[in-house]
Amino acid sequence: MSSHPDTPSQCVLIVDDDVSVTDTFSRMLRLEGYEVWAALSADEGLSLAQTHQPHAIILDLRMPLTSGLQFLRAIRAIPLLTNTPVAIVTGDYYLDEAHAAEIQALGAQLRYKPLWLEELVGLARDLLGGDPVD
């Protein structure tokens, strides 16, 4: 947990259609001192991202209506969010090479579920370049 209570925490946006994933990831990151916003759809996530301009985004690849890859393309087209660090998290171990290559070309990390506490916190630190404070 952060030892700087007066320093604003870094904001992470979690986008996943599985409420148990968003709840678990949110709780785990909040315990580490991050501010967390959560969305249950890509459309809701895009709205939150534009409103709150998170420091990093962790999102699911497979979501109904708008996929994580479509979300990533949209984020990269928004000037204020173009350089936001993004990680796509998926349980799809047989991801097609073209999709994996596009994710990499769009500057996002690709990780596989399940993510345990240490892995999730490590991912957040990696995306944000360090501790959960500015």
What are these regions (language model features)?
Residues 8-20, 25-29, 57:
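Conserved acidic segment of CheY-like receiver
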Residues 38-47, 68:
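Helix N-cap/capping motif at the beta->alpha junctions
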Residues 60:
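Active-site residues of response regulator receiver
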Residues 63:
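Receiver (REC) domain active-site loop signature in two-component systems and cognate sites
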Residues 89-91:
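Hydrophobic/aromatic residues positioned on beta-strands within the core alpha/beta folds
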